[in-house]
Curated annotation (Swiss-Prot):
Keyword Thylakoid in record: yes
Keywords on record: Chloroplast, Membrane, Photosynthesis, Plastid, Repeat, Thylakoid, TPR repeat
Full protein name: Photosystem I assembly protein Ycf3
Covalent S-S links between cysteines: none
Annotated InterPro entries: PSI_Ycf3_assembly (IPR022818), TPR-like_helical_dom_sf (IPR011990), TPR_rpt (IPR019734), Ycf3/AcsC/BcsC/TPR_MFPF (IPR051685)
Localization in the cell: Plastid, Chloroplast thylakoid membrane
Organism in which the protein naturally occurs: Chara vulgaris
PROSITE patterns: TPR, TPR_REGION
Family note: Belongs to the Ycf3 family.
Listed Pfam families: TPR_1
Membrane topology type: Peripheral membrane protein
Name of the gene this protein is made from: ycf3
Amino acid sequence: MPRSQKNDNFIDKTFTIIADILLRIVPTSQREREAFTYYRDGMSAQAEGEYAEALQNYYEAMRLEIDPYDRSYILYNIGLIHTSNGEHAKALEYYFQALERNPSLPQAFNNVAVICHYRGEQAIQQQDIESSKAWFNQAAEYWKQAIQLAPGNYIEAQNWLKITGRI
């Protein structure tokens, strides 16, 4: 039984019902429906902190999904899991793959910026000032792209850019 049929909370059940209705109304292939089911199950597992299960579902969704836009969200969510697990290099790979398919994904730009900023902070702790400047400059560039796509979001990033003279 797919995970999406086991959901206990109201929001997940509502989302599942609406998604199922949309899948019946909108003309989609069996492959597209299967890909979406795996994606939805991946999101559900991810929300519950079941990252291994979520990754399995996302990888299966990637195998089935052919639409680049839809694939971008799957890749983005895989990146989120790797970020949560502290696997920043792997996360960056997935965020960049997501952005290749969908360059209008501000949350991916934001997450790349957050990782760059984190690496800048690490460089400061190691007293590597030149590397920290480079990481912070990269973070600034990615945050600028995120803000350009979603001007009302990322207020903390906007403040950081102003305070550090990068905007």
